[in-house]
Amino acid sequence: MFFFSIEFGIIFALFFIAYWLLRGFLRLQNSLLLLFNYAILWYFGSLYFALVLALFTLFIFAASHAIAATDRKSVFLASVALVVCNLSFFKYFASFKDGFENLLRFFGLDVADIDILLPLGLSFYSFASITYLRAVYEAKRVGKGAPSDYVLLQNPKLESLPNLAIYLSFFPTIIAGPIMRSDFFFAQLHSVRFWRAKFANLIITLLLFGIVKKVLLATYVQEYSEPILRNPLNYNAIELLLGIFGYSVQLYCDFSGYVDLVCAFALMLGFTLPPNFNMPYMARNLKDFWARWHISLSTFIRDYIYIPLGGSKRGFWLTQLFVLIAFSLSGIWHGNTINFLIWGALHGLGLVWLNSLRALGLGLGSGALAGFVARVCTFCFVTFAWLFFCYKDFGDSVGFLGAFGENLAQPVGLRESVILLCGFVVFSCYPLLRNLQRMCVLYLYKIPNILKPLVLGAILCVIFVFMPDGIPNFIYAGF
């Protein structure tokens, strides 16, 4: 991952210095940010990725002005539909490519083998563009009834092409989010930004947390769980449980570690990002889980799929249908295999079940024990659903479940029993870590500035000593 490369460190350091030398010159600062966004996409991606994004930005710019210039809702809906079609084409081209080529050959047409790469960050800047188009459309509705040129010339949500390009290419969020709403971003882009020394300790903490989560925790857990998931028939039932539980931990550390890093990079430039995680494995039910996991995606699903379908205003059973549709679409967005659809549908069905129990007045009750049992049940369900997320092929997921059933009678060794017990203890103590980041920030405040480089240097040396060879890419960068 290029965030951990020496090249990125050098380039970002030079950009950081130049960026803050321009403080007070907002237009120059924003221009430099735009240049850096595209330079990163080009240098660490490809010219192809940068060109696709540039063309996409031009389309969104034209579409936003078309939306602002007319009272017809169809223009807004058509623009969003084209964004979704563009995303679907690139994301699912590989799925229908072979069938399409075979169909052409059936009719005697010779076609060259064509491969189209999924542009880096396409999903996240597509979602961001939808929030922008909707903001323009909603602002136009507010201005309805004004003079005919009001909408075109004074729509408060319309942005210049350079500003829109900065938003869609913003390097901290382009790879794997968080999905930043346009209003949230542009309010910061239009404000004069100053370096605030009080943020330094938070930035350091976020960087350290991100590095530890990704480089140490996620990578070491992956080294343990990946062989188990790759060859489930070779392991007993407890080891298989440890493998899939390990994947749950790996995915969280990997993704939340990424978010910590990009939040630090954004804060270094004077921007704050929306929260994306809030101790998700503390959740007592699936609704609580989705209020804590990938928050920017779950709120996007709520506001741009679930509520437009009808939300909770169409009666109980239609509401449950909308929940199921929304989460199934979320699964399809993650990937083009049946497994991702199953993963999304499982979460949708789980929420329907939860809502049905609540409608009947049933539940585990209150109290510490009931809360802990609810946490365990939620974590186990989420982990079971991850089984269809981590395997691309449905047969592999079924093979894992089959191996688990076949190997139940195999003897369990002391090693895996101790690991399972330790994992249970860590899970039980997990809520105690809710204020860990805040505590680290406060601790850094207590360290004299003259000693702080020595302390941080020692911490980084320890991380360097214990870090494994090779750092895998962030998992969500593939979506």
PLM ranges: what are they?
Residues 1-478:
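Membrane-embedded transmembrane alpha-helical bundles that form the catalytic cores
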